[in-house]
């Protein structure tokens, strides 16, 4: 699929239909919109960040958008192609809870080693706080990114080894309604 700018082939449509929660018509509509916004058939990092700035004018979304871009860009070529875009959109908007949790874990696992360290989570949480700016009033026990991450680690890092595995992340997320709520927020952030 890559940087094609024409209609999707039947094979491409079939493949995307099998690997996403969208039907053929929806895939074609998303593809048409993607090409309208990205005539080259790909979305560069700087353009992705610009789009995020439009959605969060009262905050600074650059850091979060850059982290998010990395999760989208599966082939690490510096661009988001339609297949990458529609796959993430499918997972975040229509995926199962388990799929959404795996996707969120991938966002936090910055070095892709299968674990989330305190610093990795702090990086993402701080970027979310910066992005939201003055739009959100925080609880006193989550007034800073550090406080939020300490609270999350206390909940999730059951064996207190300093990092969170995918299983710990899944289990901890299921008992904290705010995390499930945040996963549903991603529906609107992407």
From Swiss-Prot:
Q: What is the effect of changing residue 2 to A?
A: Abolishes N-myristoylation
List residues of the EF-hand domain.
24-59, 60-95, 96-131, 144-179
Q: Could you say which residues bind Ca(2+) 2 here?
A: 109, 111, 113, 115, 120
Q: Which PROSITE patterns match?
A: EF_HAND_1, EF_HAND_2
Record-linked InterPro entries: EF-hand-dom_pair, EF_Hand_1_Ca_BS, EF_hand_dom, Recoverin
Give lipid-anchored residues (N-myristoyl glycine). Answer: 2
Residues noted as binding Ca(2+) 3 in the record, renumbered to the chain: 157, 159, 161, 163, 168
A single Gene Ontology biological process assigned to it is: regulation of signal transduction
The record's annotation in Gene3D superfamilies points to: EF-hand
Q: Which UniProt keywords apply?
A: Calcium, Cell membrane, Lipoprotein, Membrane, Metal-binding, Myristate, Repeat
Q: What cellular-component terms does GO give this entry?
A: cellular bud membrane; cytosol; Golgi membrane; intracellular membrane-bounded organelle; membrane
Main location as per UniProt: membrane
Q: Which GO terms describe its molecular function?
A: calcium ion binding; enzyme activator activity
Q: Which residues form a coiled coil?
A: none
Q: How does it sit in the membrane?
A: Peripheral membrane protein
In terms of Pfam families, this protein maps to: EF-hand_7, EF-hand_8
Q: Where does Ca(2+) 1 bind?
A: 73, 75, 77, 79, 84
Q: Where in the cell is it found?
A: Bud membrane
- Subunit info? Binds PIK1.
Name the family the entry cites.
Belongs to the recoverin family.
Q: Other notes on this protein?
A: Binds 3 calcium ions via the second, third and fourth EF-hand. Present with 7160 molecules/cell in log phase SD medium.
Q: What does this protein do?
A: Regulator of phosphatidylinositol 4-kinase PIK1.
Supply the name of the protein.
Answer: Calcium-binding protein NCS-1
Organism classification, top ranks? Answer: Eukaryota, Fungi, Dikarya, Ascomycota, Saccharomycotina
């Amino acid at each position: 699929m890559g940087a094609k700018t024409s209609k999707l082939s039947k094979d491409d449509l079939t493949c995307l239909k099998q690997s996403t929660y969208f039907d053929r018509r929806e895939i074609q509509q998303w593809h048409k919109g993607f090409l309208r916004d990205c005539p080259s058939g790909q979305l560069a990092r700087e353009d992705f960040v610009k789009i995020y700035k439009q959605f969060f004018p009262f905050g600074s979304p650059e850091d979060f958008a850059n982290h998010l871009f990395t999760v989208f860009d599966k082939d690490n070529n510096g661009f988001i192609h339609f297949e990458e875009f529609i796959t993430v959109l499918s997972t975040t908007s229509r995926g199962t809870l388990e799929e959404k949790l795996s996707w969120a874990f991938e966002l936090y696992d910055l070095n892709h080693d299968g674990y989330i360290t305190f610093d990795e989570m702090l990086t993402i949480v701080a970027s979310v706080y910066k992005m939201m700016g003055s739009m959100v009033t925080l609880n006193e026990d989550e007034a800073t990114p550090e406080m939020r991450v300490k609270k999350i680690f206390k909940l999730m890092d059951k064996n207190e080894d300093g990092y969170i595995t995918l299983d710990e992340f899944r289990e901890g997320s299921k008992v904290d309604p705010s995390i499930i709520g945040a996963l549903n927020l991603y529906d609107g952030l992407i």
